[in-house]
UniProtKB/Swiss-Prot annotation:
The lineage of its organism: Eukaryota, Metazoa, Ecdysozoa, Arthropoda, Hexapoda. Keywords: Disulfide bond, Hydrolase, Immunity, Innate immunity, Metal-binding, Secreted, Signal, Zinc. Its main location: secreted. This is Peptidoglycan-recognition protein SC1a/b. Coiled coil: none annotated. Residues 46-170 form the N-acetylmuramoyl-L-alanine amidase domain.
Length: 185
């Protein structure tokens, strides 16, 4: 009887997981530090802003964990931010990694932070290659954001360079996202 209950619970958990879509590697799983503080982020946001970290690229989970820890250390220790700046990050391994996560305001696009989620690709996409699994992960994450009510269904997608004087998100990402359905020029 206990095994049947356990099996039923496992099926329900898996069904819930599948309904939410893309798997997000938690901050604890990649060895991130807890935030010093958080600011709540509203629901049904109007914007998603795409970035690149302009740093090291990673191809494996272990490499991505190390890069994430480095980005977080730079943001917290050098810039004095309470946490890594982005809500989510995507590695060359195709995984989505938790940054500030859902419902916490990021520090990725100045005055746009209260109205947007920030998604960053690990690497410098002026020369690093954007792989199909990374594109798929980003699109699934955006769909999840709409399904969970974090983004409005009519959200607008911008590259960071559209809201700030920067090369971010790099030429390769810039060329890719301009073909996505929610992108606005």
């Amino acid at each position: 009887m206990v095994s049947k209950v356990a099996l039923l619970l496992a099926v329900l958990v898996c069904s819930q997981y599948m309904a939410q879509g893309v798997y997000v590697v938690s901050k604890a799983e990649w060895g991130g530090r807890g935030a010093k503080w958080t600011v709540a982020l509203g629901n049904y946001l109007s914007y998603a802003i795409i970035h690149h970290t302009a740093g090291s690229y990673c191809e494996t989970r272990a490499q991505c964990n190390a890069v994430l820890q480095s980005v977080q250390a730079y943001h917290m220790d050098s810039l004095g931010w309470p946490d890594i700046g982005y809500n989510f990050l995507i590695g060359g391994d195709g995984n989505v990694y938790e940054g500030r996560g859902w419902n916490n305001m990021g520090a990725h696009a100045a005055e746009w932070n209260p109205y947007s989620i920030g998604i960053s690709f690990l690497g410098n996409y002026n020369w690093d290659t954007l792989e199909p699994n990374m594109i798929s992960a980003a699109q699934q994450l955006l769909n999840d954001a709409v399904n969970r009510g974090q983004l409005s269904s009519g959200y607008i997608l911008y590259g960071h360079r559209q809201v700030s004087a920067t090369e971010c998100p790099g030429t390769h990402i810039w060329n890719e996202i301009r073909g996505w359905s929610h992108w606005s020029g």
